[in-house]
């Protein structure tokens, strides 16, 4: 439990730059060290608050003790703003955001630099929306034409998807916005997706379904 809370605090501290004009990202080691110090000053109730979600797209912090709230926005081809869930005191939220080309179109360019610039642009719009985390990119492998979210993903090739997502995440996180890779793992149908069972052997998981996620983390 302590490691879970430490990780949350470290993430919160590492993404506090989203309201500034220029991202000032600290390293993971720096954030973890600072999180350890912040954790010492939190009450038990404050620690418990950090172990669960609070409404959608929101994780409570402890602003009085230097730990900001974490606001998240959903994404596929840009930033989806939900004004009711964002803090009106943080920044002046834009009424509209850019409709970017779908991720499958980005993958079809085979252009790593473009993927990086795409992620950077989405990252800046996330910050303009007053959020620190973008719930994206979507990156499941395109295995079935029946998947209703194929347009969000980066194609059927694990290597290409990995190259695209690695550059996308690099660009996005250079702005101070944290990427949240989704939807782990083998999410290849929208029909009853919270109830269905994906039967996949270990080799397929390791060779096809997880490489892109690993690339996004590394």
Model features per residue range: what roles?
Residues 1-23:
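Bacterial Sec-dependent N-terminal signal peptides
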Residues 20-218:
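Glycoside hydrolase catalytic-domain context in secreted enzymes
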């Amino acid at each position: 439990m302590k490691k879970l809370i430490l990780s949350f605090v470290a993430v919160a501290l590492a993404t506090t730059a989203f309201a500034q004009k220029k991202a000032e990202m600290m390293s993971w080691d720096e954030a973890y060290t600072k999180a350890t110090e912040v954790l010492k000053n939190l009450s038990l109730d404050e620690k418990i608050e950090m172990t669960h979600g609070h409404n959608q797209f929101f994780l409570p912090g402890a602003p009085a003790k230097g730990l900001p709230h974490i606001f998240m926005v959903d994404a596929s081809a840009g930033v989806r703003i939900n004004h009711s869930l964002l803090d009106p005191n943080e920044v002046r939220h834009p009424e509209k955001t850019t409709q970017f080309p779908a991720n499958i179109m980005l993958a079809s360019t085979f252009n790593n630099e473009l993927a990086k610039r795409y992620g950077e642009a989405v990252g800046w719009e996330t910050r303009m929306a007053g959020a620190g985390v973008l719930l994206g990119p979507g990156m499941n492998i395109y295995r079935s034409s029946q998947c209703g979210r194929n347009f969000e993903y980066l194609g059927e090739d694990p290597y290409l998807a990995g190259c695209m997502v690695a550059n996308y995440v690099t660009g996005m996180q250079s702005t101070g916005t944290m990427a949240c890779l989704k939807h782990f793992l083998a999410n290849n149908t929208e029909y009853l997706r919270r109830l269905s069972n994906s039967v996949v052997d270990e080799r397929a998981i390791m060779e096809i379904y997880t490489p892109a996620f690993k690339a996004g983390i590394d």
